Design a protein with these regions (language model features):
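Conserved short alpha-helical segments that host acidic/polar catalytic motifs at enzyme active sites
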Residues: 1-159
Length: 159
């Protein structure tokens, strides 16, 4: 089962995210990753197959992971193999997300939103990111309106 953590606040996000993911290891997983809002005003992704300890080593290698906002995820594969590309978080355009569950209509959404050829992974989660990004662009970058339409598009159990 996937584990999810998010943080925004005055402390350094990377340590909070990594410690939170380490606390979720008992749930079982095959890969882990984080996304954080960097000092350069960009969202950065770091993800890997394997243990949270391997993710911590990758984070240490980054030149600047200081951030006060981020999300983290441990994945238990339901769609696609155990690869770095399939690890969360996923990004499509301006949307970066993590997700737990199964989106049953992800094949239909891939076709409906013309995502074929734009996906880097084999996951329903990246399809969800692509759909939300498309809606965000269509709805004049209104996040609330985009999310309202987004949840109406998805079929399945997810969080």
């Amino acid at each position: 089962m996937c584990g999810i953590i998010g943080y925004t606040g005055p402390l350094e996000a990377d340590n909070i995210l990594l410690n939170g993911l380490a606390g979720l290891e008992y749930r079982g997983y095959d890969s882990a990753g984080i996304a954080y809002f960097g000092n350069d005003s960009k969202i950065h992704l770091i993800k890997t197959v394997g243990k949270v300890a391997a993710l911590k080593e990758l984070v240490k290698q980054e030149s600047d992971c200081s951030s006060h906002c981020g999300i983290g995820h441990t994945r238990w594969a339901t769609h696609g193999g155990v690869t770095t590309e399939n690890a969360h978080p996923h990004r499509q355009g301006l949307v970066t997300l993590i997700h737990n569950g199964i989106i049953e209509n992800y094949h239909q959404l891939t076709e409906e939103y013309d995502l074929e050829g734009h996906l880097l992974s084999q996951t329903d989660s990246e399809v969800a990111a692509g759909v939300l990004n498309a809606l965000y662009e269509r709805m004049d970058h209104d996040p609330l309106l985009s999310i309202r339409h987004f949840v109406k598009e998805l079929k399945g159990s997810y969080g």
